[in-house]
């Protein structure tokens, strides 16, 4: 296993385009409604996924209880697969740079797996042969063809395996046959097939690791100032890694933060000594070096604010937050997984939100620079 040097300075089936209509605006973004519970009365499940073309994938329940994976960009949505056909259950979706929605699904008769494209035409991996079942959900590169998943094989010494693939040969990234004891439920992959994940070793240390099949690089681990890490780190197409961790500061206090690993060094992006008390479950990082996360501000003199942010200033870096106007209503709340790594290389952000008028809806936030190009 190759370990990078880490500094002590602290500081992740192409569809036809239809015209998208913005429904509301903040100072830096306009918002395009992808779907709401008017069309999906049985509910829409978070999180949602976004690719570089602005296509958003989500799981929703139509009239009659038909559940499916759907894709839209603002206008009519396309059904990728639903329970009126082969599949009986769907997990959280992804969407790759080819426009193919990727998803976990059960087919009945104890058969299930990860699939891509219309009606799951491409099988990423199924629970046949050596594969017993799966853990976590699929993550796909928004700019490439690769997807990564965690699976549970039948071999006792390999209780967990992370693999990546694009519908062809599946590549083993990491497993628990050696020093690792627990692997990330939600690894992430970039356009070149490099996978980032959090893992705990059998000696109770833990860290953030990157691999593409073969030797792994250690981005950060608990041999230094870091004391713990969260699952779901992000990786961009340059191989930079954004992760959430806890660290001991110079005063011996434990603080939480978002940290960036780039070219063997680590710097602090944001931490809990600032305006935010929490940074959500799955921060995002794009090729421009922009970040996005679902955060909650500290409640010192005002009520805490939950929303999606792109930096440390809750006002200047706010994309959308509770009590903001949106689509003829106001934002009443976010689920824990309203946002999960759904930032693309154009700076667009997809998310699920609850509105004061009773709707639950999926939106894409479009930065004004993107719309003006």
Describe these PLM feature segments.
Residues 1-11:
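Bacterial N-terminal signal peptides that target proteins for export
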Residues 25-373:
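Conserved "turn/edge" positions that cap or connect secondary-structure elements
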Residues 9-22:
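Bacterial N-terminal signal peptides
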């Amino acid at each position: 296993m190759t370990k990078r040097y880490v500094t002590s300075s602290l500081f992740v089936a192409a569809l036809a385009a239809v015209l998208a209509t913005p429904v509301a605006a903040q100072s830096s973004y306009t918002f395009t409604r992808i779907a709401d519970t008017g069309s999906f009365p049985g509910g829409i499940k978070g999180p949602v996924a976004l690719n570089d073309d602005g296509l958003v994938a989500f799981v929703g329940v139509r009239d009659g209880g038909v559940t499916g994976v759907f894709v839209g960009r603002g206008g009519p949505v396309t059904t990728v697969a639903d329970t009126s056909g082969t599949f009986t259950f769907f997990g959280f979706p992804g969407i790759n740079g080819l426009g193919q929605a990727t998803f976990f699904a059960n087919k009945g008769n104890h058969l299930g797996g990860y699939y891509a494209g219309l009606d799951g035409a491409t099988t990423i991996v199924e629970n046949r042969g050596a594969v017993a079942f799966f853990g976590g959900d699929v993550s796909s590169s928004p700019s490439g063809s690769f997807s990564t998943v965690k699976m549970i094989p039948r071999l006792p010494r390999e209780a967990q395996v992370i693999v990546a693939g694009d519908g062809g040969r599946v590549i083993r990234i990491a497993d628990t046959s050696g020093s690792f004891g627990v692997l990330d439920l939600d690894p992430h992959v970039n356009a070149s097939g490099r996978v980032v994940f959090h893992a705990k070793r059998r000696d109770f240390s833990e860290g953030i690791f990157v691999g593409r099949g073969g030797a792994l690089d250690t981005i950060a681990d608990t041999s230094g100032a870091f004391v713990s890490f969260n699952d779901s780190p992000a990786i961009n197409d340059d191989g930079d890694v954004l992760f959430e961790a806890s660290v001991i500061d110079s005063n011996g206090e434990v603080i939480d933060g978002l940290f960036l690993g780039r070219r063997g060094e680590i710097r602090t992006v944001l931490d809990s000594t600032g305006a935010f008390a929490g940074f959500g479950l799955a921060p995002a990082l794009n090729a421009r070096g922009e970040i996005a996360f679902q955060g909650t501000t500290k409640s010192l003199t005002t009520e805490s604010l939950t929303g999606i942010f792109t930096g440390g200033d809750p006002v200047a870096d706010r994309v959308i937050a509770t009590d903001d106007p949106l689509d003829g209503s106001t934002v009443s709340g976010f689920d824990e997984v309203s946002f999960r790594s759904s930032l693309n290389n154009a700076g667009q952000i997809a998310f699920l939100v609850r509105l004061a008028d009773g709707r639950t809806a999926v939106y894409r936030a479009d930065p004004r620079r993107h719309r003006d190009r």
